[in-house]
Every structure is written in C-alpha cells, then in structure tokens.
Amino acid sequence: MAQKGQLSDDEKFLFVDKNFINSPVAQADWVAKRLVWVPSEKQGFEAASIKEEKGDEVVVELVENGKKVTVGKDDIQKMNPPKFSKVEDMAELTCLNEASVLHNLRERYFSGLIYTYSGLFCVVVNPYKQLPIYSEKIVDMYKGKKRHEMPPHIYAIADTAYRSMLQDREDQSILCTGESGAGKTENTKKVIQYLAVVASSHKGKKDTSITGELEKQLLQANPILEAFGNAKTVKNDNSSRFGKFIRINFDVTGYIVGANIETYLLEKSRAIRQAREERTFHIFYYLIAGAKEKMRNDLLLEGFNNYTFLSNGFVPIPAAQDDEMFQETVEAMSIMGFSEEEQLSVLKVVSSVLQLGNIVFKKERNTDQASMPDNTAAQKVCHLMGINVTDFTRSILTPRIKVGRDVVQKAQTKEQADFAVEALAKATYERLFRWILSRVNKALDKTHRQGASFLGILDIAGFEIFEVNSFEQLCINYTNEKLQQLFNHTMFILEQEEYQREGIEWNFIDFGLDLQPCIELIERPNNPPGVLALLDEECWFPKATDKSFVEKLCTEQGNHPKFQKPKQLKDKTEFSIIHYAGKVDYNASAWLTKNMDPLNDNVTSLLNASSDKFVADLWKDVDRIVGLDQMAKMTESSLPSASKTKKGMFRTVGQLYKEQLGKLMTTLRNTTPNFVRCIIPNHEKRSGKLDAFLVLEQLRCNGVLEGIRICRQGFPNRIVFQEFRQRYEILAANAIPKGFMDGKQACILMIKALELDPNLYRIGQSKIFFRTGVLAHLEEERDLKITDVIMAFQAMCRGYLARKAFAKRQQQLTAMKVIQRNCAAYLKLRNWQWWRLFTKVKPLLQVTRQEEEMQAKEDELQKIKERQQKAESELQELQQKHTQLSEEKNLLQEQLQAETELYAEAEEMRVRLAAKKQELEEILHEMEARLEEEEDRGQQLQAERKKMAQQMLDLEEQLEEEEAARQKLQLEKVTAEAKIKKLEDDILVMDDQNNKLSKERKLLEERISDLTTNLAEEEEKAKNLTKLKNKHESMISELEVRLKKEEKSRQELEKLKRKMDGEASDLHEQIADLQAQIAELKMQLAKKEEELQAALARLEDETSQKNNALKKIRELEGHISDLQEDLDSERAARNKAEKQKRDLGEELEALKTELEDTLDTTATQQELRAKREQEVTVLKKALDEETRSHEAQVQEMRQKHTQVVEELTEQLEQFKRAKANLDKTKQTLEKENADLAGELRVLGQAKQEVEHKKKKLEVQLQELQSKCSDGERARAELNDKVHKLQNEVESVTGMLSEAEGKAIKLAKEVASLGSQLQDTQELLQEETRQKLNVSTKLRQLEDERNSLQEQLDEEMEAKQNLERHISTLNIQLSDSKKKLQDFASTVESLEEGKKRFQKEIESLTQQYEEKAAAYDKLEKTKNRLQQELDDLVVDLDNQRQLVSNLEKKQKKFDQLLAEEKNISSKYADERDRAEAEAREKETKALSLARALEEALEAKEELERTNKMLKAEMEDLVSSKDDVGKNVHELEKSKRALETQMEEMKTQLEELEDELQATEDAKLRLEVNMQALKVQFERDLQARDEQNEEKRRQLQRQLHEYETELEDERKQRALAAAAKKKLEGDLKDLELQADSAIKGREEAIKQLLKLQAQMKDFQRELEDARASRDEIFATAKENEKKAKSLEADLMQLQEDLAAAERARKQADLEKEELAEELASSLSGRNALQDEKRRLEARIAQLEEELEEEQGNMEAMSDRVRKATQQAEQLSNELATERSTAQKNESARQQLERQNKELKSKLQEMEGAVKSKFKSTIAALEAKIAQLEEQVEQEAREKQAAAKALKQRDKKLKEMLLQVEDERKMAEQYKEQAEKGNAKVKQLKRQLEEAEEESQRINANRRKLQRELDEATESNEAMGREVNALKSKLRRGNETSFVPTRRSGGRRVIENADGSEEEVDARDADFNGTKSSE
C-alpha cells in the first residue's frame, strides 16, 4: 500500500515503504540468476541460483556465501519476484510454498510489520516489544474502513467482525489461537480496546448517567482477571492459566449494552507448586510487593522467601513492576464496583492461601499419625478466615468420618494431612476466582438492556509442551485440538461443501488436516474408551492407581495411530499422544486425584460456618459437592460399566470440562468465526529473532498454506441474490427490466452489464460467489456511482429551490404592483369629500354595541376567576393525594423487593436441596444395584473357579510336555499366518493407491490439455524483459532523489535530536508538577463528590417541587393569556372610540366652516344650522358621558388585571429564581465534577504519556544516532549502487540470451524425451525379468509352505490321537517316546525351514520398503507438480483478467478517438467561419478606407477654395489706395466676406462632422479587426497546442511502436531459436523487420529534422507576435492621446480656420507617427522626439490662436490692423504649406512600409501554415506506413506463432504419451511388488501384466507411427506456411491451393482463421497503442 510523503513513526510499523521494495538490483538478480529456495539447516530455506540440472538433481549456488550445493528437484521451491516482497496478503504470492510464506513473514517481522493477512485470516508474530500501533490515532484510522483500504492489523479484523455483525445480523467470534507465548492475550485486549472505542454506548445517547462506565469496566476486567489468573511460565511472562470467552452484547444500533465472561479450567495446582523459573499467579507477588505497612499488618504478610507455596521465591518479570501492577489492579477493582471491604476480603483470602502452605506436619515417633508441632501458621490462617484454630487443627489431623451409621474420628498420616491442606488451598483459590468472575459479570451486565447480537472473543491457553506435562496440559491441548479442528472444518470442509451444495463446478480437495482421530483418542466414551473415559472409570475403583490407569490405557489404545508408549520409560505412568503440533509425553502421576478433586468435609463445613461473611459466602454451596467418601463403601471388585456416569452422579473434573468445552464449541459453530493465528518467533522471548523451523512447524500445524490455497482457488466472498441485486443494482440500472422478479436471472443480467470476467465469479442456486477482491472493487464502483447520483440530486434540488425562489419573487412583484396600485388609488381617493365623510361616519355605527360587549366581557372575566380559584383548590388536594400515594408506593416497593429477595433465596435453597437429594438417591440406588450384581457375580465366579481348578489339576500332569510343544508350533503358525495376512493387506492397499494414482493421472492429463491451449498467453511474460531497461533508468533517478532526501532527513534528524533533548528536560519538570497537581486534585475530587451527593439529594427534592410549580405556572399562564386577550380587545375598543371622537370633532369643525360659509345664504339655512348645533351639543354631551363611564370601567378592569398579573408574576419570578438557582448549582456541581474527573483522567494519561514519551524519546534518540550513522553508510552505499546500476542496465541484455536459451532447451528436451522412451523400454524389459524371477521364488516358497502345512496337519492328527488315548499312555509309553523323538527331529527340520522362510520374507519386506520409498518420492513429485499447476492456473486467471481490462481500455479509447475526431471537425468548421468573417471584415475595412479617402479629397478641395478666397482678399488689400475708397465700401465688402466666411465655416463644420463619423467608423472597424485578430490568434494558438499535443501523441505512438517492434523482433528470434526447422522461413521476416527498423530510424531522423524546423518557425512566429503585441499596445496609447488632442483642436477650429489646418497637420503627423511606430520598434526614440516636437508645436499654435483671437476682436474696432493681420496669415499659410507637404510625404512613406510589413506577415503565416500542414501530412503518411509495416509483421508473426503452437501441441501430446508409458511402467513395478500374495494370484497377475505389456508395445508402435505422420505433416505445414507467406507478401490472392494431404488442408483453414484473428488483433493492438 503505497503512501504519499514521508511515513510517520507509527505508520512505519503498519505500511510498507514501496521505495525500498522495487529494488532494481533484486529484480535483476531474480531474472538473471534464476533464484530459487533450497532447504537450509539454519534458516529453514536459503536463496540460491540454479547453475546446472542433472536429471532429478540440480546444482545451485547459494546467494549468501557462493557455495555450490547439489539438491533434488523436489526439494527446490520457486522464488517470487521482488515486487512481492513484504506483501500484505500472502494470497497474492504468485509462487505459494513454505519458503515464500516464511520469507515474507520474516521480512515483515524484521521491518516491524507483525500483522500479515493469509487469505481469509490474519497471522501475527509476537514482536516481544512495544510497538506504537495501538494509539487512538490508529484506532481512528481503522474506524469504519474496509479491509483492503488499510494495512493488516488486529483492529481491521475487529472492525470487519463488528461491521459484519451489524450488516448481516449474525453473531461473530474472534478466535486467537496459537502456542503459549504467541500473543493471544495481548491481541484479545486490543480487540476489546477497539470495540470499546468504536461501539461506545454513551456516544450520542441522552442517558449520560453511566457515561462511558460500561466501556471503562470492560477494559478494566482484563487487569483483574490477569492478576488472578495469569502467571509467568518458561515460554511466556504473562501466560493465561485459564481460558476465557468474552461475549460482548450489542443492541440493534451497534452500541455495547453488556458483556459476559466465561472461564475454562483454571490451573489451580499452580497456587501450591511451580516449575523452575516459573511463578505462581501474579496476585501473590503483587500483594507482597505492593501492600503498604498497614495492609501488611492486617493481612499478616511476610517476605517472598517465607512462603512454601512460592516454590522459587521472588522471580522478577522484565519490564514489569509488581508494586505498580498492584495499584493498577486495586484501581481496576474500584472501577468495577468492588467496595473496599470486598477488596480487603479478597486479599485476605489470597494471604490465607499463602499461609496454608506454611503449615508443617510431622510424623509421631511410634505411629504413622501426623502432628502439628507449631500452629503459628494455622493461627494466621484461622484469623484470616474467621474460624476456630482448635477445630481447624482437629479437622485436619483427626477428621470425623462416617462408618456405617456411626461417626468416628480417624487419625491422618503426614502425607494425608499435607494433601488435605494443599487441596484446601487449591479449592479456596478456585472459589475466590469464581467469585471474582461472577462479580465482574454482574458489573458488566448491569444495564439490563437486551442485546440484538454479540461478538465473542476467545482467549484460551495455547498448545503446551513442557518437560513434565500433566492433566492440565492434556486438557489445554485437547481444547486446542478441538479449536484447530473447528478451523479446518470451517476453512476447508464447510467451504467446499457449500460449493457443491450450490452446484458450483469444484473438485473436492482433501487437505489431509483431519484431527478427529486424536480427538476421539481423548474424548471417545467407549468401543474403545478414550483417555478421559478411562480416567473416569479408574476413579470409581478404590484400589486404582495412576499406573493401573496407564496400563489400561495402553491395553485399550495401544494400536491407535495417535497413541505411543515411550521407548525409554522413566516412569510407568508415562504415555505419549501425537497432537497436531507434535508429540507430547504425559506423566499421569496424581491424575486420579486431580480428576476427583476431593476435599476434607470437616474443614469445608468449618469454612461454611465462618464468622467472616465473605469466606462463608465463598463456601456456602459446599453441600452440593458430593465427595468421594461414598467410594469407600464399594467392594474391592468393580465392573467396567462403572465408566458410564449417570445424571446426578459424581461429576469428575474431566467430565465437567468436556461438557463445558462442548458448549463452547456449539457457541462457536453458531457464530461466524474470524481466525487470528498467533505465531511465537522463538523460545528465548527475544525481539528481532525468528526461529525458522519453529515458525514453519506452526505454519504447517495451523494449516496456513492450505488456507491461502483455498482462498486463492476458491470463492471466499459470497452474497445472496436478492442482497446482491439490492446493493449493486445501481451499477447496472438499465440492465434489469421493470417488474423483473427472478433473483438469479437478475444477477446474471447485472453481471453481463458489469462486464465481469467469468473466471472471477460463480453463480450458485441461492448465492453468487466471487474471488478475493472482486466485491471490494464493486464497492468502490458503487461508492463512485452513489457520489454521482447524490451530486445530480443536489443539482436538481438546487434548481428546484432556485425556481421556487424565482416564483416567490414573481409573486412578490405582483403583490407589490397591487399594493402600489391600491396606494395610488387611495392617494387619489383620500381628498374626495364624500370618502372623508364615509370614513368619519362609519365608526359611529358600532358605538352602541360596545356597552353590551363590555358587560359580556365582565361576566366572562368573573366566571374565569371563579374557575381559577376552584382549579387551584383542586390542584392542592391532588398534590396532597399524590404525595400520600407516592409514599405508600415507595413502602410497597420496598416490601415487594424484600419479598422477592426472600423468595429468590428460598427458591435457590429449594433447588439446591432437591438437586442434592436427587444426586444422593441416584447414587444410593446405583450402589445397591451394583452391590447385588457384584455379589451374584462373585458367587458364580467362585463356583466356576472351583470347577476349573479341579479340571486343571486333572489335566496338568498329563499335558505338560505335549502342551508345550503344541503351543510352540501354534505360535509359529500364528506368526506365519499374520505375516501372510499382512502381506495380503499391503497388496490391497497398493491396489487402492494404484487406482487413486490412475484417477489423479487422468485429472492431471485433463488439466495439462487445458493448459496447453493457454500456453501462448503465458509466453507474453517474456515481454517484461524489454521493459526492465526503462525501469532501471527510472530507478537510477529515483535513487538519486532518495539520496537527496536521505541527506535532508539526516539534517532534520539532527535538528529533531536537539529538540528532543530540550523537550525531555521540560517533560521531567512537567512530570513533577503534574504529580503534585494530581495529589491536590484527588483531595478536591473527594470533597466535590461529597458535595455532589448532597446536592443531588437536594436536587431531587427541588425537581419534584419544580415540576409542581411548573404545572401551576402553565395554568396561570393560560389564565393570563386569556386576560391579556380580553385586555387587548378592550384597548382596541377604546382606541376605536377615541378615533371616532376625533373623527366627530373633525367633522364638527368641517360643518362649522361650512355653516360659516353658508351663513349669509338664506334663513332656512340658518335654522338648519341652529338645529345642527343643538344636535351636535346633544351628541357631545352623550359622547362625553359615554367616554367618562367607559374610562371608569376600563380603569377598574385595568386595576384588577394589574393586581392579578402582579401576583402571578411574583409567583412566577419566585419559581424562576428557585429554578435558576437550582439549575445553576446543578450545572456548577456537574461541571466541577466533570472538570475534576477530566483533569484527573487527563493528568493520569498525561503522566503515563509523559513516561511513555520519555522512554520512547530515549529509544528514539538512540535510534536517531544509529540512523545518522546508517544514513552516512547508506549514502555511500547508494553512490556505489548508482554506479552498479549503470553497469547492470547493460547486463539486462544478457537476459535476452537466456530467454533464447529456453527455446534451445525445448529442443534438448525433445531429444531427452526420446532417450527416456528408450530407457523406459529397457526398464520394462528389466521389470519383466525381475517379475519372472520373483514368480519362480514364490513358487518355491509356496512348495515349502505346502510341505510345512502337511507336516503341521500330521502333527495335529498325532496330537488328536494322543488326546484320545490318554488313558492308555502308561501301556504305550515306549511308543510315545519314539514318536516324541521323531517329533523332535521334525521340529528341528521345521525350525530350519522357518529360518529360511523368514530370511526370504525379510528380503521381500526390504524390496517392499524400497518400492514404498520410490512411491513416496513419486507422491512428492506429484504434489510439487500439483502446486505448480495451481500456481499456473492462478497466473492464467490473472492474465485473462488483464486481457479483459485491456479490451475495456480499447473500447474506451475508441470512444475517445471518435470524440476527438468530432471535436477536430468542429474546430475546422469554426476556423472556416472565422476566416470567412475575417474576409468580410477586410472588405468592409477597404470600403471604409475608400470612403475616408473621398472625404479627405473633399476636404482638400475646401482648403483650395479657402486659399483662393484668401488670395482674393490679399488682392483687394493690395489694390486699395492710400486714401482709397470710402469706409462704406470697405464695410460692405467686409460684411460680404464675413457672410462668405460663415458659409464656408458651416460647410467646413459639416465636412468635419462627416470626417468625424468616418473616423469613428474607422475606429470601430479597427477595434473589431483587433478583436477578430485576437480571437483568430487564440484559435490559432489553441490549434497549435492541439497540434503540439497530437505531435506528442504521435511521438509516444512512435516510441511505443519502436518498443513493440523490438518485442516482436525478440520474440521472432526466440521462436527461430526454438524451432530450427523454421529458421530458413523466418530469415525473410527478420530481413523485413530490419528494413522496417531502418525505415523507422530514417522516419525518426526526418521527424527530428521537421521538429527542429517547427521549433525555429515557432520561435520566429512567437517573436513576430511579441513585436506585434508591443506595437498594438503603443498604438492604443497613442490613439488615446490623439483623442485628447483632437478634443483640444476641435475647440481651436471653432475659433480659427488657420488653427484648424494646423491641428489637422498635427493630427496627420500624429497618425503618421503611430503608423511609423507600428512598422518598426527601432524608431521608437525618434518618434518620441517627434511627439515632443509636435507637443511644443501644439503649444505654440495655442499661443498663436490666443493672439489671433485678440486680433479678431480688435479687427471689429480697428480696421486699420486688417492689413497686418492678412500679411501675418499669408506668412503662416506659407509655412504651414511647407510643413504639410513634408508630413504628407512622410505619411505616404510610412503607409507603404506598413503595407509591406502586412504582406510579409501574411506570407509568413501562410508559409507557416502550409509547412505545418505539409509536416503533419508527411508525419501521418509515415505513421500510416509504419502501421502497415507493423500490421504486416504482426500477421506474419501470428502465422508463425500459430504453426509453432500446433507443433508444440503435437510435441506435448507426444510427451504426455511418453509420460503415460512411463506411468504404466511404474504401475507394472507396483504390480510386481505385489508378489507376496498366493501363487495363483501371482500367476494370474503375471499373465495380465504380459498381456498389458504386449498391448503397450502395440500402442508404442502405433504412437511411433503417429509421431512419424506428425513429423511429415509438420514438414508439409512448413511448406504450406512458406507458400502462404509468399502469397501474403503479394497480397493479391485471397484463397489458397489445397495440398494433397488432409493435414495440409486443415492448416490452410487454420491459416485463414488466423488471418482473421490477426486482423482483429492488429486493430485492437493499434487501438490500445493509440490510447496509450
């Protein structure tokens, strides 16, 4: 998993740094040296390179020391490429074998990466040091992430299980398995830590009363259980001496609602006895080291060496302080809710256990009775346990036992007393542990919420092999066998059964990991009974011992394959069991006692009656334990049926543990298990050391390789059809029609739409199965799709909201218009008199109704007040009743609680008594029945014994000698028959193996035939060689960059070191301050807690009062709101009345005015006025009275209302103040409490963190110092590597020769196969000769056996005669002696025959063993080939997936290409349109220029007329005489001239306006032209960029074509070397390829030249553009300045025409200056000087204009000055003419230059375009030519590859046939080995073998003929291929002439098909290349 940037310190232990993985040196070594793994005695496996192959042996050179070693081919294992170094999931390894897995684990372990995925489970190697990968930051990193998104970690396993539990609603379990010391307990703690953070129940919850308490207690349960249940062993400093299953319950939302812990088999014997260098349970050492003085005195504690039960005294644990751990344990007990009294009681029991070990007994002198000379330790024990010393001593030394109906005292021996004390200590500690566990479970399950599902975590003692292995080790190893069996069954059996159940094509694989035999050896109840059943059976026998148990075990299970008796017996109680992790030697001493676990009833009854309540509670259920005292009543003889225990009978430890384990396994089977395989790296507990053989043994035992293999080959991810459709239908929305219901068909349609590779999935009956990684890919696609959908939805929502807001604004606009219209209407209406009258009269109509409304309101108000009083009285009564009822309810609840507790206790007592009674009754009945059976059996046996004794006495004397001889012969016969039977069984076994091998051979043949079709795809791997050169070059650059980075990092590390030193000193000071603050805060916290309790009590009372007050307030607020509404209505009525009053007053005033106005009209009007005034006065009086009465009423109501409101507000304020005070006190207290707790927690954490940081900084400082030195060394090494890599790049070419050597090797293999064929024929002949020899020997043996059989028959007949004639033995004594002598001679001959027979049997067995060894070797080679075949299948699947991905890329690229073509056509259309528009604009500009020239010509004509008029005026002035003409004529002429001058001015102004319009049009055209030019330049630039991009693409394509051509050439060379027969045919292709390469190189050179020319043109074009842009900028500036000057000159023109001409001349000069600036940048300085001159000239003209204005004003007054003015004007006119002529000539010259530059620019642009187009066309033509060459070469290569494939196929078929013959020969060997059976069977087999050999020879001859035919067809095909190539070169003919042979015709047809495939592949090939 590549990480960006620099990895942090904690991430270094999680992520793999990819910069150090892709080493070019390692890659080169792997490719060049053919690196493999070979076995090593030290490292397990070593890297080596293959140097030479010698048949079945290979010579390799070790990489480490260069030593050459010869090893077998079967012992070599393939090495993975370097890119798979430190791979996170070992299922990704291409070569899966033990060496690769071990190497990967070793590399990751040495890099600090302890977690590694192994398929579906995780492997963790114990680092034996602290790693920074368990912080809160790491927890946040893994929270909610998918497994493939993060590196391997225990957090990832926990999160996966947690998410699966929530998503699938299935219970989960996490099983941490492994040997002792592998790290199971630590990983269990990390899982709980992660779940406590992720599934915290107080997040987002309202019930903050138990904020985080449950999670805190869950985390603190581990320290308590570890203190009381863990101990230091040889392998592990913190070994769990009990097993536990932690069940964490979750609700539906995923929050923790409770937990429960179950424990298994506490090793209580450790409390009294420990092995060397081991400790007892941690709590004993914690207590002695951590207890303070007062506690030491209370608990009577002593030193470590004063306790007998501490066998080794004080044994320290590295990096752990016992006193600190004691404090942590006490704190954990406090958090779990243990009171101080309970803690003290627990520690008292611990101390009493230690004191029990100090009680010493001695044997009295004359008797065996034990005595206690010193009872000091006993007094301490009794003081701690609260019992009487005398009673305790009596119970131990002289306990009371029941004999019959009497109770007597029995004196105990020293050994019995010691055993009783030790048993009491063990039982006490076990009961204490159980009590602690129940107390922890009670604390963890106090929420009483129902859990929807649970997640179980199993932490159980790992597999143990010690020097002395006892009963505890057997139980632990038995548990591990069951767990490993569960793993095997889940991973291998259930997985494959589900494949078959779902109908998936799957060949069942037997991984050979069945552990059932070993489990049955331990747990089987009968037929024959297992270890536990035999142990329980022996416990029933009173005289049974451990030796008798072992003897019976050897008798029953002696032949079991997993049971062994040690060869060298140290003790008769030893036996061995072969577990999955190895052979374990068990010592069965004291097993019967441990299994029965007896106790002294006298002591237990004492403890039950202890004065210490805690001790009595521990022993309260002592009566339920049925001791073994009843066993003494049994008779001496017992039946074997006693092993069957019935319900209610005595339950042994083994039975209880077996049942408990069965329940655990049932629970685990009902969950979905997640396995974590913990690996122990070494037994020295050293970090950084890895014992290869130890790790390999654990990997083999744990089934790691098999788990990876089934994960790779199988389909581990599966999902139900409906869920798959529901979850991933979004990815194929249109694939399923609406209303489609069939789930399976829907999934098939979705899969087709998703275009998944068929090899990646399988569709079953109810589920769809996927390979690893496919579902993760689909999840990523789904997330992307959902993101797009959400974005589209958000866009639609925003659009809807925008439209809605727009509609709302439109409605507001219409409303505003309506309001405006109404306001305008009102403004028009308000001044209308009738409207004013209407508004004044209308309110008066409602005055009469106000009195009635007021009266009704008063009545209503009175009723409301009465209801309020009544409600208040009822409220008080209800409050009183409520308080009474609540008190009664509390009393009833207390009584009910007491009753329920009493009932529960009574029920529990009743159940216990009933169970006890039932047990005792059943035992009694069983004993009585067995006693009767035993008595009957005893009587029968006695009678039979007497009869047998009599018979034996009769026969003993007669048959002593004959019986001895007969037994001897019988033994020999039995042994011979057993050997023959064994040989027959071996023959049957070999037959089965032969059949099995033949089936496997068929399977392998089918697989190999499938693989041969896909061999062409495998050949593509050779292409990787050509890419190595590029990779090495990139590696060199990367190494240089890394070197620089290393130097920077070294400097940063030095800075960091200095910074760390300063921080360390600061942290020391902070630690001291924090410790002081912690002490102060603890004091404050205690005080605040007391205050908080008191405040909470007050708060509860006040909350009840507050609730009542709030109810009153709500009711009063309702009344207030009603009154407020009434008051508002009254106020509104009053306002209306006042308004009416004002309106009436205004109306009265209006009427007065009207009356005053109309007073003088008529008398009738006066009368009306008087009447109106009277009415008005009456109305006024009435109105005043009403207002007064109304005001009085309102005043009264206001007073009443204010009184009520004030009372209510006072009450409300009081309640509010009380509530505010309470809330304030509550908040302050809660805040202070939370702050103090937070500060305390933070300070504690800070202290720990500071200490941790201190240690970490010290470590980092050392590491930094070492890194600095390492960095210097690495820098030097990197410099050397850079030089080496440059040399190694050159060595890559050597790899090509190796690849060519592979092809040559194929030819050699063909020759070797021919030689092997001859060898097999010779072997076959030898086998037949050996078979004949064996058959002759067997015939001889059979004859001898028949003779022996006849002799045996004769002896049997003689024996029968002897038995019939026993009575006549005395008479025939002499005859019998003779017969006996003959018999002795025959016995000797039989002895000699037996010896010969035995020798021959030994020779046959030796041959059998040799054959068996050969068979094992073949089996090994078969397994290796099977593994390689599996790896090839996996690689084939990967290649297919790559091909499908490339096809998808090809389709995408075709789409992109079509889009690019559309865009290019679009751009071409736009370019044409822009050129057309530019042409139109140019024509418009030319027409405007012509119009401008016409306007200038008109202007020039006007100037000429003006000049003529001036000349006439001069003539007139010159023609006047001195006295001349009179003034009247002069004035007349003056007026005429002035009128003419005015007319000329108007004409001039009109012309100027026209000129101005034309100039404006010209400016607009220039601006438009400028914009068009800018747009055209942008388009041109965009096209240039596009062309540049296309050029780059073409260059890339050319480069890729070069690489492809190089690949094709190399492959062609390889093919030519592989098949020498085709060399002549392929020479033409090589020549063509060389010519193509030369053409390509010439094209590349031409392309480089064109590129250089293009760059030159581009530079020139860019320079021209830059100069043009600068000219345009200066021109714009000058235009702006010119416009300002034009404005000034316009004002001057109005005053004087002469100044106008000067302005125009200056303007012309300005325009000429601008054009001169546009033409050349070199004349910029001259133009600036010219501009300054013109500005000076303009200023001068302005001064002259002022003077001329003064002259014009003076000319009206003084005519005399006209002559001077005319002369002055004529002079100025002459000068102006000369300057105008100069400017005109300069302007024309600049215009010519501008036109020339424009034409040059256009010519250059046209030339550049034409050159660019021509270069593009040339390049495209070259590319097309090269593509055609590549296509032609590809077609030729495909044809050659096709022919090569067909020859390879034929060759492989021949190889397979040869292999079949070899296998058949081996089969004959095996059949020859079966010659140990009967002679007839051997003869029949020999005849069958001869027939089979003849048939094989016929087949071989037939195969030889077929081989000859195949070679002839190959030659014919070669000729036809040459003909086809010649036809393909011509390319005219499309059909081929068939040859004579049918094989030739098939080749031609295949060639046709291959041509089509070649065309299709070429098209795909070109598409993919262009896409790249």
UniProtKB/Swiss-Prot annotation:
Binding site for ATP: G178, E179, S180, G181, A182, G183, K184, T185
SUPFAM superfamilies, sorted: Myosin rod fragments, P-loop containing nucleoside triphosphate hydrolases
Span of domain Myosin motor: 85-783
Gene Ontology biological process terms in this record: cardiac muscle cell development; elastic fiber assembly; myofibril assembly; skeletal muscle myosin thick filament assembly; smooth muscle contraction
Region of interest (Actin-binding), residue spans: 661-683, 763-777
Domain Myosin N-terminal SH3-like: 31-81
Biased composition (Basic and acidic residues): 1789-1802, 1866-1876
Function: Muscle contraction.
Free-text note regarding domains: The rodlike tail sequence is highly repetitive, showing cycles of a 28-residue repeat pattern composed of 4 heptapeptides, characteristic for alpha-helical coiled coils.
Name the record gives this protein: Myosin-11
Origin species: Oryctolagus cuniculus
Gene from which the chain derives: MYH11
